[in-house]
Each structure stands twice: as C-alpha cells, then as structure tokens.
C-alpha cells in the first residue's frame, strides 16, 4: 500500500506501508485544515475527523 504522509497536497511525499489502509485526519469544524496523513486507520479523536481508505494514494 502506498499512502501520502504529509499535511498539505503541495508536498507529495509518499510512504510504502504494511497496513492495508491509509488515513487523512482533519479538524471537524474547520474545512481544509488537514492535521496528518499516513498508514493505518487510527481511532477517532474529539474534534477530529479521520477518513480511512483502502487503495494506493487514496488519502490525498
């Protein structure tokens, strides 16, 4: 699995992951503010939304 591992889409850093999912974490009430991207699917947090997906580079 190949996932993006950066906070903004301008820096197209990718990593190869053993996990079969990628994630994108962002602030729930502030559209467009991405906190993190990476491998796996972390647990939900208060005031954070996490989008998990199952294909290469799906967390853009």
UniProtKB/Swiss-Prot annotation:
InterPro entries associated with the record: Snake_3FTx, Snake_toxin-like_sf, Snake_toxin_con_site, Toxin_cobra-type
Distribution of this protein across tissues and organs: Expressed by the venom gland.
Location (main, coarse): secreted
Keywords of the record: Disulfide bond, Secreted, Toxin
Protein known as: Toxin S5C4
One Gene Ontology cellular component: extracellular region
Keyword Secreted appears in the UniProt entry: yes
Stored SUPFAM superfamilies: Snake toxin-like (SSF57302)
Lineage summary: Eukaryota, Metazoa, Chordata, Craniata, Vertebrata
GO molecular function, one term: toxin activity
